[in-house]
A protein has these predicted regions:
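Conserved class I S-adenosyl-L-methionine
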Residues: 5-57, 71, 170-173, 177
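Class I SAM-dependent methyltransferase SAM/SAH-binding core
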Residues: 63-65, 69-116
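A short acidic, Gly/Pro-enriched loop at the edge of an enzyme's catalytic core
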Residues: 115-126
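A short SAM/SAH-binding and catalytic strip from SAM-dependent methyltransferases
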Residues: 126-137
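A short glycine-rich, Lys/Arg-flanked "PGG" loop and its adjoining helix->strand segment in the class I
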Residues: 140-151
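Conserved beta-strand signature within the Rossmann-like core of class I S-adenosyl-L-methionine
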Residues: 152-159
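Short alpha-helix
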Residues: 182-197
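Core SAM-dependent methyltransferase catalytic element
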Residues: 203-221
Length: 221
């Protein structure tokens, strides 16, 4: 039994290492495949999930952390919201820039890290992140987010989604999400660093047709 447990731990570490390398490529040299891969593993729901958050953003100025290929950027531009974006991936920056320019929009994108936001204090009413990695609860990130938010500012995060549909392809997608660690069981303790930084946290589970989203609203106190 102990040996089986150890083998399982080794397997999980190997899978985790391989996934980290895969995502490193996906945000780097293979960024051009991001939309296809995200759409495939989510059964085409990925963009719908990202755009669902647009309803929670009122502006007038919003900063998106990890803007990726720019789908939310475009949606907020079209809503008339003043939107900025920052991403550590230059490749993602190029994809988002092209998407916005093609739509006749003027990008306001920065290459950089959430722990060092190049914006003045109190610049934004809201900061948003969809499917961020663990950087979102880093002490440096949270301190910077709090700094750039105005006095009544809010951090909006969608960290995870679950595919709940019962059709064969939906069940297969849910399984793929589970084994790749993209749909973990939620543990509210993950938000302790957010609360400790001076935010009041509200958690919403939003049910869609064949999926469920976890959306976090964290307001400055």
């Amino acid at each position: 039994l102990i040996e089986a447990f150890r083998q399982n731990q080794c397997t999980n570490r190997l899978i985790s290492t391989l996934l980290r390398f895969f995502f490193y490529l996906l945000y780097g040299s293979m960024a051009w495949t991001y939309d296809w891969v995200a759409g495939f593993v989510s059964r085409g729901l990925w963009q719908e999930w990202v755009l669902e958050v647009a309803a929670d953003l009122r502006g007038p100025k919003v900063l998106e952390l990890g803007h990726g290929p720019g789908h939310l950027q475009k949606a907020l531009f079209e809503k008339g919201i003043g939107i900025c974006g920052i991403d550590s991936s230059r490749q993602m920056g190029r994809l988002a820039h092209k998407r916005l320019k093609t739509g006749g929009l003027e990008p306001n994108l920065v290459n950089g890290f959430a722990q060092h936001l190049p914006f003045a204090s109190g610049s934004f009413a809201q900061v948003v992140a969809t499917f961020p990695t663990e950087y979102i609860v880093d002490a440096g990130t949270l301190a910077e987010v709090r700094r750039v938010l105005d006095r009544a500012g809010e951090l909006v995060v969608m960290p995870v989604a679950w595919i709940t549909g019962k059709r064969l392809l939906e069940r297969a997608a849910a399984y793929l999400f589970h084994v790749t660690g993209q749909a973990p069981e939620w543990d509210d303790r993950a938000l302790d660093p957010v609360r400790e930084t001076g935010f009041k946290v509200e958690i919403e589970r939003r049910k869609l047709k064949s999926s469920e989203l976890l959306i976090i609203h964290a307001r400055k106190i």
